[in-house]
């Protein structure tokens, strides 16, 4: 998985993985990043890594207006090829 950390293989060829935010997605909303259209992955969670108490530690099932920050981690679902394409971007 290149830059991705494989968390769980759901079925043959499909996994849930944690990846760093690609540079092209930092400081964009999920709608602006358009990851599903560009790579086919589904973002299940945005995990916040900073200690800022004003930001939640995790955004479960994020919506199109949820912001992606450079220091976040994305928990995504997709095929190995889709996840590799996304994690190779960053």
Locations of regions flagged by a protein language model:
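Flexible, Lys/Arg-rich cytosolic regulatory linkers and terminal tails that connect or flank
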Residues: 1-27
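Cytosolic Rossmann-like ligand/nucleotide-binding regulatory domains
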Residues: 27-90
């Amino acid at each position: 998985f290149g830059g991705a950390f494989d968390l769980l293989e759901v079925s043959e060829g499909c996994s849930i993985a944690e990846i760093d935010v690609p540079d092209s997605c930092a400081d964009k909303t999920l709608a602006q990043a358009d990851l599903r259209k560009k790579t086919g992955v589904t973002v299940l969670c945005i995990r916040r890594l900073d200690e800022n108490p004003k930001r939640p530690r995790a955004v479960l099932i994020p919506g199109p207006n949820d912001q992606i920050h450079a220091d976040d981690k994305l928990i995504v679902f997709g095929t190995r090829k889709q996840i590799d394409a996304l994690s190779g971007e960053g």
